[in-house]
């Protein structure tokens, strides 16, 4: 179990099944009381490992390390190393003492805990690797406090399970947490971070499934509303719809939530729509269970409509499909005269319920023949399926399908499919009076129909041979860039292909890849400041205390109603003078940017020398690039981009994989499209419309498009271009 934690935390969900295996082996007569005790023990073990061993082992080591580093002046990680040695020696001595005194149960508990900790110690490799400061070092867990944050999955935040507030609940206050971090002087320091909001008791309720305030009423209403009401119909702009005679049109609409009034901090009365308890229950069954679990289950054992991921629930994409016409027509409508892209989609796989039915037969067979082992498989099925649905408390609008999360549950059902073959064997023996060997062969032949149809239906859309487009996206982005460039990207799809090319295949080690999604983390800013491969660090100038648990959001004002040079702006933010601060409502002082119009001078000679501008375009350069901040605040990642622009002095080309990275700075008029990536250039090209952003230098881009870029062998008819490949290819075309 300890080793499995090092592989994936979801392995803990096998604990109930393992406890029942032990219980069944140790008892001859299974009783209801015994099963209740076994369940309670399984829950206790699960909580002990997940809530005590995993967090508190490292937490104690982190506290000792803080004492050793801050008080005794010893090196970082010396305290947790001594604690680990003392823990191993202590557990070893305790287990030996328990053995000598004949304390069997205590000895088993101590040995089990020791083995769990031995496996858990594999996470020490994470700290060892981080200490080496590799080019890719997520969260930089080079000390026990950073490792603890990683293990606690702090970056994902908390979500309520049994009791809490819903998405519409107005915040009453903030939740804060003290965190430890390693400062530049080698000492541990503390900071206070915002972890959430507090809410008035009247906005707290049981079973809060609709908790994510970033989603809003529209996303939840689609899945949770089950009541209707008659009211005046309105269009998307809120205008009343009228018939030919000009009379207001009335119709049935979804009735959602209940109105609740409250008094805000300014003493004004406001109203919010609060979902009811039964709407939360409906959302749980309709979206979280049905759409986000049973739909995936049916994909695997009944069939799948297509490999197209819908942006929202539709009747044409993303559903299960059996291949049995009368069932499918009832569920997803008529299947005649379908568009070609639906009817010929290789992801349209139909199994005619055969795997599902064979699994049900196996389930009933095992239940009748071996109830003990049936309960073990059932524990695996439930814990890795329905229990995870409850724990994840998923919100609508997932960026990708999450069927892989429930693979363990589907493995359990596949066991019942195997028992279904055994059921056929027993049936053949009973009907034909043949020996077991002949019946086993016959049952196997019959059972092979299921994997046979799965193979026949899935082979074409799961065949990735020859398709290299995911890799080639990264290749193309990197090859778009000039030597010694910095390329800014956003999100997974624009990041991992670049990392793969650079770190695995050694493509363009001179380019610094910077993921702006991570740039809000102080660890990533520190990482970007250092050299990686052959690429120098990003020229940030703000000191560590300005971005370490600080300035997650910085205000932008028009205090100076004229363009201010960018270095002066960064110097203003860097200053600790109280006059360079703004006083917040709670009386604290915060950094701010005093101007929305910022001047970025152009060093033309550097721009020419670095290749940012070709010699033939010398006369097209402007003297100053003007940044126009359109918002009243910037996120930390945008502040750091501003810092980079203040200090790069046009010595290194800057690229973006998406034009919108610079949209909030008003810099979309200063881009050049180099085939895949956009180059930031001091040449004004007024923004025209989406898809026509920036200028193009044919002498630079055309050779790349024709001779350098790779397109994943998509011109080969034998290579399958699935939905995500087509989606990313369309995005590349749009750019």
Give names to the regions the model predicted.
Residues 1, 9-406, 413-484, 496-735:
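ER/secretory pathway lumenal C-terminal domains and tails of membrane proteins involved
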């Amino acid at each position: 179990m300890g080793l499995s934690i090092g592989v994936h935390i979801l392995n803990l969900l096998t604990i109930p099944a393992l406890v029942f295996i032990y219980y069944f082996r140790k008892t001859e007569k299974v009783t209801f009381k015994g099963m209740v005790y076994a369940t309670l023990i399984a829950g206790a073990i699960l909580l002990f490992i997940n809530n005590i061993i995993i967090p508190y082992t490292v937490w104690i080591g982190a506290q000792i390390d803080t004492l050793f580093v801050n008080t005794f002046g010893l090196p970082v990680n010396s305290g947790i190393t001594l604690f680990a040695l003392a823990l191993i020696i202590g557990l070893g001595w305790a287990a030996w003492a328990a053995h000598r005194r004949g304390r069997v149960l205590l000895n088993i508990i101590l040995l089990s805990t020791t083995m769990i900790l031995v496996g858990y110690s594999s996470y020490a490799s994470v700290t060892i690797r981080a200490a080496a400061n590799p080019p890719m070092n997520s969260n930089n867990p080079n000390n026990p406090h950073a490792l603890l944050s990683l293990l606690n999955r702090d970056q994902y935040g908390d979500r309520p399970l049994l009791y809490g507030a819903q998405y519409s609940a107005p915040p009453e206050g903030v939740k804060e947490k003290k965190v430890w971090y390693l400062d530049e002087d080698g000492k541990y320091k503390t900071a206070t971070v915002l972890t959430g909001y507090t809410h008035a008791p009247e906005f707290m309720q049981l079973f809060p499934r609709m908790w994510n305030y970033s989603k809003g009423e529209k996303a939840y209403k689609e899945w949770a509303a089950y009541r209707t009401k008659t009211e005046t119909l309105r269009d998307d702009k809120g205008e009343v719809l009228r018939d030919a005679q000009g009379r207001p049109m009335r119709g049935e609409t979804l009735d959602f939530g209940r109105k609740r009034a409250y008094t805000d901090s300014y003493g004004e009365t406001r109203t919010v729509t609060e979902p009811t308890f039964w709407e939360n229950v409906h959302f749980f069954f309709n979206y979280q269970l049905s759409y986000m679990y049973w739909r995936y289950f049916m994909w695997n054992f009944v069939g799948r409509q297509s490999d197209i991921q819908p942006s929202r629930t539709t009747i044409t994409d993303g559903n299960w499909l059996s291949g049995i016409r009368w069932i499918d027509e009832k569920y997803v409508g008529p299947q005649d005269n379908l568009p070609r892209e639906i009817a010929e989609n290789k992801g349209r796989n139909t199994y005619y319920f055969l795997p599902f039915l064979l699994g049900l037969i196996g389930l009933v067979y095992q239940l009748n023949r071996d109830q003990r082992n049936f309960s073990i498989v059932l524990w695996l099925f439930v814990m890795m399926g329905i229990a995870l649905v409850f724990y994840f408390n998923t919100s609508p609008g997932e960026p990708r399908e999450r069927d892989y999360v429930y693979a363990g549950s589907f493995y359990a059902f596949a066991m019942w499919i195997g028992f279904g073959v055994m059921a056929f064997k027993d049936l053949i023996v009973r009907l034909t009076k043949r020996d077991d060997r002949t019946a086993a062969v016959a049952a196997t032949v019959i059972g092979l129909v299921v994997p046979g149809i799965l193979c026949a239906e899935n082979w074409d859309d799961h065949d990735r041979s020859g398709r290299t487009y995911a890799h080639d996206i990264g290749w193309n982005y990197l090859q778009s860039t000039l030597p010694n460039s910095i390329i800014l990207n956003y999100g997974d799809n624009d990041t991992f292909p670049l990392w793969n090319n650079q770190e695995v295949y050694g493509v363009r080690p001179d380019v610094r890849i910077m993921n702006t999604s991570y740039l809000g983390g102080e660890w990533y800013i520190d990482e970007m400041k250092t050299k990686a491969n052959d690429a120098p660090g990003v020229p940030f100038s703000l000191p560590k205390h300005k971005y370490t648990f600080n300035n997650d959001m910085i205000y932008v004002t028009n205090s100076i109603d004229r363009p201010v040079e960018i270095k002066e702006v960064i110097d203003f933010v860097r200053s600790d003078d109280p006059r360079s601060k703004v006083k917040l409502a709670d009386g604290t002082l915060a950094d701010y940017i005093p101007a929305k119009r910022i001047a970025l001078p152009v060093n033309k000679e550097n721009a020419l020398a670095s290749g940012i501008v070709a010699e033939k375009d010398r006369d097209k350069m402007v003297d100053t690039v003007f940044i126009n901040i359109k918002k009243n605040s910037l996120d930390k990642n945008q502040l750091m981009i501003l810092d980079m622009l203040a200090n790069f002095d046009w010595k290194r080309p800057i690229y973006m994989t998406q034009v919108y990275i610079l949209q909030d700075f008003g810099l979309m008029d200063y881009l050049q499209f180099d085939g895949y990536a956009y180059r930031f250039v001091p040449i004004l090209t007024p923004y025209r419309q989406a898809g026509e952003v920036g200028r193009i230098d044919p002498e630079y881009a055309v050779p790349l498009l024709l001779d350098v870029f790779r397109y994943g062998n998509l011109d080969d008819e034998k290579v399958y271009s699935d939905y995500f490949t087509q989606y990313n290819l369309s995005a590349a075309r749009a750019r």
